[in-house]
Amino acid sequence: MKKSLLALAIGLFAWLTPLCAQEWTLVWSDEFNTDGRPDDAIWSFEQGFVRNHEDQWYQPDNAWQQDGLLIIEARRDDRPNPTYRPNARHWGARRERISYTSACLHTRGKRDFLYGRMEVSARIPTAGGAWPAIWTLGSGMEWPSCGEIDVMEYYRVNSVPHILANVAWGSDRRYQAVWNTRRVPFKHFTDKDKNWAQQFHVWRMDWDEQSIRLYLDDELLNEVPLITTVNGTIGQHTNPFNSPQYILLNLALGGDNGGTIDDNAFPLRYEIDYVRIYQQRP
């Protein structure tokens, strides 16, 4: 009888162990509960005209915490570009004036993670030209061999609003990415709820040794097997998603993907309720 009970106990333990292994433990989070400047121990800011020929000038003044939210605000502006040089190599330095400002926050050098679950609750602006994003990048290699995960992008594709969930890695050509992209027409969400854009939603990434899975309100938008995400020759055939990634939150305007900016919609607010990182613990 004792042997039977022991065998039953061992079998039950063996059955329960895989279930326990799937439990998620909160590793760190930012709930944005303190009014004022975002936590310098977690977040840094980009500055200036940065990427994708976007129209906004990034600056820290356009992001703050208030009433339990991180607020990123895009504004109209009109002032000289302090980095202006008419013959500069970088496109941003060739712009004489700053017409819009916004903010991009990132955790590079402060908080990164390898595998796990990331959840971000946010309310996004959807006016013309808005290009909000939740994304991650790797360190130690130049883009795209560092790897990029777009947990959320919103912009217009051929003038039609879309939510995007993408993964990118390096090819055999410098600065040329291989993309696994899922574009979901915004109408897919607003048909279910006409007030979708006025509400907060949860974007989630589940990332392990086998795949990256991207969700919106528990709906799977894209699943990318890591067996497919091997860099080309520039990245020495490494897999960027076997290394840590850091987080970026930004509100871009116009540029290569954002589309025509609606100047009557300003200021635009991108509001983030929380960022949470979980890992599986045995």
Q: Where on the chain are the PLM-derived regions?
A:
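Short amphipathic alpha-helical "recognition" segments used for binding
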Residues: L6-A7, V157
